[in-house]
Amino acid sequence: MSTRTALKTHNEIRLVFQRMACEIAEAFSDETDLYFVAINARGMAIALELNHELDRIQSNCNVSLGNIHVADDYRWEGVVPNMVALTTPVILIDDVIHSGGTAMQVLVDLYEHGFDTIRTAFLAEREHRNYPIRADFVGVSIATTLQEHVFFSNENPSDLQLYLI
């Protein structure tokens, strides 16, 4: 059985979301609209947390939420790209960036839609990427071995967990 090592407590993760939202608010202070594109369910959980924190900081910014399911069938939910103005800044959001393959796949799709500005946000960043993906907004950077995995658990919203397996 794999051992789990806690990387961040629930309260620390809440602070990470607050900091990331502040960074996004600062980077897009002149914008009134943003488009959050979340990858899979855990990406959507993070997008919702960031949106909540952004509302507390910068209430004049309207955030549209889209969710892309990549693992099984590559399907969109919520606000799809053709419903958003191409001048609206896009922030691609996921829980952990590992090799960068999933993010690369979605970034290519968003680029082909013609968006002017696309940035990325990840709760956790590992340093073992196979693709040239830059993490613009990062909660925590973690040096791992190739055999280790970083996992975000939001099964219990009052006990968020980030741990190393």
Predicted regions: what they are:
Residues 1-31:
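Active-site-facing substrate-recognition patch
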Residues 33-35, 62-64, 89, 116-120:
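Residues at the starts of beta-strands that form the adenosine-phosphate
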Residues 98:
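Short active-site segment of divalent metal-dependent hydrolases/proteases
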Residues 108-165:
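PRPP-dependent phosphoribosyltransferase catalytic core
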